[in-house]
Amino acid sequence: EEILEDCKRHEAKKVHRYSIVTAGRALTGAEMEKALRAYRAMKKECKVELCASHGLLSQEDFNRLKEAGVGRYHANIETSRRNFPNICTTHTFEDKLEVIRRAQAAGLSVCSGGIIGMGETWEDRIDMAITLSELGIKSIPINILRPIPGTPLEHQAALSEDEILRTIAIFRYINPTAMVRLAAGRNSMEHSGEQAFRSGANAAITGDMLTTSGNRISEDQEMLAAMGFTL
């Protein structure tokens, strides 16, 4: 019920996509059933497009999500194939690619991007953008690392705004027809990342994220309207 009411609140603010995001390797058992019930309820009572992010699911689970009304699945590849083992040890880069292929086989569109500022090179960022292009991804979130105390990357130096903007421009150049989405970390940029929309970003994930707070919907709407964008 809480999820349904939250979805309705966001729909009233003209948000056109609503996503449930869970942590962990994969949502299974009773938790998956709970998520499916929530998706069915939202599909019945709301007009927003439904998105999901539940880890490394099986083909059967992707089929069930599709039947429950989910239209898009979120599965970040995080970084380049070369850099992935430096960031994640619980699963492989190929596991990520296989999950994307399963979601696509179930008839879901896929939202996939990554995190910048984790110590990767420019070559890693370019390779990540090329991989997403080869997968046919049309929704690419770019998250900016905000080091959190107690995590392995807590001492990672923050990216300059210029480097962030150049990275966004590269992703736009390699993926000219995709929605390049500003995601977590952009509220650390000047004016909530306003310049990023002039550098190639043409979408944003608004509201709170899994581990960090995000921008208020009203603030994003005002900023984008002032820049002349159609919402």
Positions of predicted regions on the chain:
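Core AdoMet radical
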Residues: E1-D6, H10-I100, S109-G113, K138-N143
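Auxiliary Fe-S-binding modules of radical SAM enzymes
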Residues: E5, S133-L231
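Conserved strand-turn element in the central/C-terminal portion of the radical SAM core barrel
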Residues: Y18, G24-T28, V99-E123, I142-A157, ...
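Conserved, mostly hydrophobic/aromatic
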Residues: I20, A75, A103, L132, ...
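Alpha-helix N-cap and loop-to-helix initiation/capping positions
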Residues: A30, K34, C88-D95, E120-D127, ...
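Short, hinge-like loop/turn segments at secondary-structure boundaries
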Residues: R37-A38, A68-G71, H91-F93, A129-T131, ...
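Anion (oxyanion) recognition and catalysis
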Residues: K43-K44, Q104, A225
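Catalytic cores of alpha/beta
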Residues: L57-E67, M118-S133, N187-S199
